[in-house]
């Protein structure tokens, strides 16, 4: 049995803000008769997936676009965030008249399994024990996230998605969708991502995880029950990760060596420089909306991601015979997922016989460029979806 209901807040007990008035998140609950099979061998049941929708599904159910969020994102793509009150994380791209036009497409975005904004994760309650899962929650993978999304799409009565779109960890999910469900994805827009996590990126994630686990308030993952939260460790993890989302040029342009509210150094360990103050703010604000254990689980899921590993190490074999149309996007200053990674994906798609276009966008805004106001990226996304829509026969009146 599958139940769908509204939710009024995220899973983490520290987060008490009310959900935005419009649109309200929905949550699909899957009971014990519909378990989620995980790569670790566990059948997770019951579980729930929180999601948002924007726009209307057409009568043919042919205009649905699934957006897959990145590591620290959630389902609140284009509405005010219920915890922070800030605009949706992709409000630049999603909305009426925008590339992902909500007056033409039916947009879906779900919080990934293992997340902390309504979907089942380590901050949820284990129904067998009545306790918060904590580290008893099973380790999850990108394929697990996609299986859960597919179950949600089934619940919504949608057979084929017009497009699957996402950047970073979201882009990994896009690629996994195309491998696991090739007949269900008409077009795909993977952005600033790769088909496997690099050693460098695994190293950065391990740094963040160790920062969390070294915080005395982490309490071996049982901090919720003990009324604590590893704010310092999670804040440091966020600061370190955030540096990888930027670029040297962007940091120089935005901050340089400028002082923060002073003309001379204090000769102390206060935040003398603007860039220090900025990073501290990134860390302190992040801990107010994200669960520390979820951070551990989701970074580990990214680390395990390797599409070729399930195809005898031959990446092209994963895409062989696919009919999905692809547009792969990278950014010149992205050193977290450099253009070479995207080119390798494109080469594999070509070798597999896929229809694929590739765009490398010149910008100094680093990995986070896909979340920012980059007109060239908007133009490419719009043109790709327009072309795919014409190929599929999506007339304006039908969208």
Swiss-Prot record:
Domain (AB hydrolase-1): residue spans on this chain: 63-372
Active site location: 168 (nucleophile), 334, 367
Pathway the protein contributes to: Amino-acid biosynthesis; L-methionine biosynthesis via de novo pathway; O-acetyl-L-homoserine from L-homoserine: step 1/1
Keywords per UniProt: Acyltransferase, Amino-acid biosynthesis, Cytoplasm, Methionine biosynthesis, Transferase
Binding positions (substrate): 238, 368
TM segment ranges: none
Entry GO terms, CC: cytoplasm
Gene3D superfamilies (alphabetical): 1.10.1740.110, alpha/beta hydrolase (3.40.50.1820)
GO-annotated molecular function: homoserine O-acetyltransferase activity
Protein's recorded name: Homoserine O-acetyltransferase
Role this protein plays: Transfers an acetyl group from acetyl-CoA to L-homoserine, forming acetyl-L-homoserine.
Domain of life: Bacteria
Compartment(s): Cytoplasm
Region (Disordered): 1-32
NCBIfam families: homoserO_Ac_trn, PRK00175.1
Organism: Nitrobacter winogradskyi (strain ATCC 25391 / DSM 10237 / CIP 104748 / NCIMB 11846 / Nb-255)
Family classification: Belongs to the AB hydrolase superfamily. MetX family.
Annotated catalysed reactions: L-homoserine + acetyl-CoA = O-acetyl-L-homoserine + CoA
Ranges annotated as biased composition (Polar residues): 23-32
Ranges annotated as biased composition (Basic and acidic residues): 12-22
Enzyme Commission numbers on file: 2.3.1.31
Disulfide bridges in this chain: none
GO biological process, one term: methionine biosynthetic process
């Amino acid at each position: 049995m599958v139940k769908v209901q509204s939710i009024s807040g995220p899973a983490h007990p520290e987060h008490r803000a009310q959900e935005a008035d419009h649109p309200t998140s929905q949550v699909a609950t899957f009971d014990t008769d519909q378990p989620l099979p995980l790569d670790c061998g566990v059948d997770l049941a019951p579980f729930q997936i929180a999601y948002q929708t924007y726009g209307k599904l057409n009568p043919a159910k042919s205009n649905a676009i699934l957006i897959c969020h990145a590591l620290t994102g959630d389902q609140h793509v284009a509405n005010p965030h219920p915890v922070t009150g800030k605009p949706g994380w992709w409000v630049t791209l999603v909305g009426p008249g925008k590339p992902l036009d909500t007056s033409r497409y039916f947009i879906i975005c779900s919080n990934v399994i293992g997340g902390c904004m309504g979907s089942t994760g380590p901050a949820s309650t284990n129904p067998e024990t009545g306790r918060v899962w904590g580290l008893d929650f099973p380790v999850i993978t990108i394929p697990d996230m996609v299986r859960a999304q597919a179950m949600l799409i089934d619940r919504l009565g949608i057979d084929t998605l017009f497009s699957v779109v996402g950047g970073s960890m979201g882009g990994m999910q896009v690629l996994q969708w195309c491998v696991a469900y090739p007949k269900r994805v008409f077009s795909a827009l993977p952005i600033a991502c790769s088909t496997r996590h690099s050693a460098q990126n695994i190293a950065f994630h391990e740094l963040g995880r160790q920062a969390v686990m070294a915080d005395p308030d982490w309490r071996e993952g049982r901090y919720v029950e003990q009324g604590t939260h590893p704010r310092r460790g999670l804040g440091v993890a966020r600061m370190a990760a955030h540096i990888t989302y930027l670029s040297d040029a962007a940091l120089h342009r935005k901050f340089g060596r400028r002082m923060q509210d002073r003309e001379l150094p204090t000769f102390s360990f206060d935040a003398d420089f603007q860039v220090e103050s900025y990073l501290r703010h990134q860390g302190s604000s992040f801990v107010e909306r994200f669960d520390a254990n979820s951070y551990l689980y989701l970074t580990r899921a990214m680390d395990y991601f390797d599409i070729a590993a399930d195809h005898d190490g031959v990446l092209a074999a994963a895409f062989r015979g696919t009919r999905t149309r692809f547009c792969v996007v990278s950014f010149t200053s992205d050193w977290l997922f450099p253009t070479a990674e995207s080119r390798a994906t494109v080469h594999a798609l070509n070798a597999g016989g896929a229809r694929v276009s590739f765009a490398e966008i010149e910008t100094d805004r680093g990995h986070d460029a896909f979340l920012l106001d980059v007109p060239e990226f908007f133009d490419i996304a719009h043109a790709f979806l327009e072309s795919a829509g014409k190929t599929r026969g999506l007339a304006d009146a039908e969208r």
